[in-house]
């Protein structure tokens, strides 16, 4: 391990996944969306770290965990420009950018109080209409919602 890696604000990771460029105010929402509180491996969370792009950012380092695209893309609703680094033996072997999926299942609450998903025990399902601006439409009642109106379940 080189000298400069020891000077990082958050310790280097031998193997696992680094989720970087998380807006600080969304960090704990991302933790919840990924279910990290249920994991047994080492997890390092950096909050309000200095960032040239964001001013302040969050970072999550998860030891020995490699997420599938479907797991990671869930966070695109709250943090659309997050970067993933896959680490093996202290080296970045792959970089990924979070992409919004075509559908969001059981992640978002429908804003329509009359929607069946708010009145029956069933999972929500939304179709993504506009990935750039995060506009989604409920599969059941067809109500559209924008990012600022979205409530995460």
Curated annotation (Swiss-Prot):
Protein name: Aspartate carbamoyltransferase regulatory chain
Cofactor: Zn(2+)
Presence of keyword Metal-binding: yes
Role this protein plays: Involved in allosteric regulation of aspartate carbamoyltransferase.
Stored PANTHER family: ASPARTATE CARBAMOYLTRANSFERASE REGULATORY CHAIN
A GO-annotated cellular component: aspartate carbamoyltransferase complex
GO molecular function, a single term: metal ion binding
Record text on subunit structure and interactions: Contains catalytic and regulatory chains.
Cofactor comment text: Binds 1 zinc ion per subunit.
Binding-site list for Zn(2+): 110, 115, 138, 141
Origin superkingdom: Bacteria
């Amino acid at each position: 391990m080189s000298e400069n890696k020891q000077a990082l604000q958050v310790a280097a990771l031998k193997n696992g996944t680094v989720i970087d460029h998380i807006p600080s105010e969304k960090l704990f929402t991302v933790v919840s969306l990924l279910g990290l509180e249920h994991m047994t491996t080492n997890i390092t969370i950096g909050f309000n770290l200095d960032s040239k792009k964001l001013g302040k950012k969050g970072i999550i380092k998860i030891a020995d965990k490699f997420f599938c695209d479907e797991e990671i893309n869930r966070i695109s609703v709250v943090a659309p420009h997050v970067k993933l680094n896959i680490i093996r033996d202290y080296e970045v072997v792959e970089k990924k950018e979070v992409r919004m999926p075509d559908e969001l299942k059981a992640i978002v609450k429908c804003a329509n109080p009359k929607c069946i998903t708010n009145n029956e025990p069933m999972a929500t399902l939304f179709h993504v209409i506009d990935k750039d601006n995060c506009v989604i439409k409920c599969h059941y009642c067809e109500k559209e919602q924008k990012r600022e109106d979205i409530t995460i379940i």
